[in-house]
């Protein structure tokens, strides 16, 4: 019942003329409570809500102990405005703008004709979480060590290859990569909206090996994270009408936040992952535990159960780890009937037609 009530609150629009943050307290047992908080995405991001949660726990603990409430360490709205205007007038902003102007993806990605939403899906409600096989997590660690890349680069590579298989294009793939714009110390105490999304554009010619693709992806991620503060959406909305609505997003979310309320331990977790333009895959956990959740209404992925997508990604990861020297063209990422569907969407038959003089 608590989840249903929280979901109802979550699906009730917050008017921009009213409060953009809301809280509710549910008592489920004599000694068990749930605190539910949500904020309009223009006002606070996930890290901002974590700051608020820690502050609530601090105030509660002080009241229970009969102690003075510690002063807040939050920055103010003025601090946020000054931080953003200062960045906009800086050389860093100009460098970041130049970089992203040269690294926007072309008007490609998933086929434009497949942007329609799957019936019964919305862009916010996440799926259930499915745990990846610990043996597969071991393969991720192994490949990460052998190639000297970060672990999340392996998961991102598998996601990119799956998205590429459905795109009808064999030479390039573009993903949305959510990032935090909190790159300076002052921004890390602001309970505000400082999240962003940057495009991750990857060359994936068929002859490239798995290892080369993974290393290139890791290098590309390191490069773009040097420019993660820039609001890339301001360029994508105004340069050539580029749209991101048909790109798959891949996001990595930290494990649950542990809080203490007057000696009582509490665990905080996200009930959704924010707005999703097309479709998103969310990897959660730490160590040997890795969970996958999805959200979004974009096809074809919204028609798959999360367990199916997890199984597909696991097969890709196992194949990648087994032979990093194999070419990308040797990876069979689709089922037999799915190849025919992609051929139809991408108009592959046109390649066999005689050229028009």
Feature-to-residue mapping (PLM):
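Short amphipathic alpha-helices and their capping loops
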Residues: 1, 5, 17-19, 54, ...
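Acyl-thioester-dependent condensation/acyltransferase catalytic cores
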Residues: 1-37, 44, 102, 106-109, ...
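AMP-binding/adenylate-forming domain of the ANL superfamily
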Residues: 2-4, 49-50, 79, 93-98, ...
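Active-site-proximal acidic secondary-structure segment that organizes catalysis
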Residues: 24-78, 163, 302-322
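His-Asp-centered acyl/peptidyl-transfer active-site segments
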Residues: 31-32, 85-97, 143-156, 166-269, ...
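Extended, hydrophobic beta-loop-alpha segments that form or line the acyl/peptidyl-thioester binding
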Residues: 50-56, 152, 171-178, 205-212, ...
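Flexible, non-catalytic linker and terminal segments flanking ANL/adenylate-forming cores
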Residues: 222-224, 253-262, 300-357
């Amino acid at each position: 019942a608590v989840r249903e009530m929280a979901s109802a609150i979550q699906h009730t629009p917050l008017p921009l003329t009213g409060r953009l943050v809301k809280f509710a307290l549910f008592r489920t047992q004599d000694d068990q409570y749930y605190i539910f908080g949500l904020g309009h995405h223009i006002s606070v991001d996930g890290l901002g809500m974590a700051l608020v949660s820690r502050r609530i726990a601090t105030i509660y603990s002080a009241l229970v102990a009969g102690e003075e409430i510690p002063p807040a360490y939050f920055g103010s709205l003025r601090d946020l405005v000054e931080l953003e205007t200062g960045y906009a007038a800086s050389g860093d902003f100009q460098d970041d703008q130049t970089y992203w102007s040269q690294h926007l993806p072309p008007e490609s990605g998933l086929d434009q004709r497949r942007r329609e939403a799957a019936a019964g899906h919305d862009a916010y409600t996440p799926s259930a979480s499915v745990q990846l096989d610990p043996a597969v997590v071991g393969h991720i660690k192994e490949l990460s060590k052998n190639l000297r890349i970060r672990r999340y680069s392996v998961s991102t590579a598998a996601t990119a290859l799956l998205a590429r298989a459905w795109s009808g294009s064999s030479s390039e793939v573009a993903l949305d990569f959510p990032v935090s714009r909190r790159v300076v110390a002052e921004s890390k105490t602001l309970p505000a909206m400082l999240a962003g999304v940057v495009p991750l554009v990857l060359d994936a010619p068929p002859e490239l090996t798995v290892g080369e693709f993974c290393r290139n992806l890791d290098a590309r991620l390191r490069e773009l994270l040097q420019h993660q503060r820039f609001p890339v959406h301001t360029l994508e909305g105004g340069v050539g009408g580029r749209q991101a609505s048909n790109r798959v997003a891949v996001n990595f979310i930290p494990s649950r936040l542990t809080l203490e309320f007057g000696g009582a331990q509490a665990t905080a977790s996200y009930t959704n992952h924010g707005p999703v333009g097309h479709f998103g895959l969310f990897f959660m956990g730490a160590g040997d535990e890795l969970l996958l959740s999805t959200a979004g209404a974009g096809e074809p992925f919204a028609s798959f159960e999360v367990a199916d997508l997890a199984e597909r990604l696991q097969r890709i990861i196992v194949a990648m780890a087994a032979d990093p020297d194999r070419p990308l063209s040797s990876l069979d990422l689709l089922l037999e009937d799915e190849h025919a569907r992609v051929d139809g969407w991408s108009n592959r038959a046109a390649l066999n037609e005689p050229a028009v003089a």
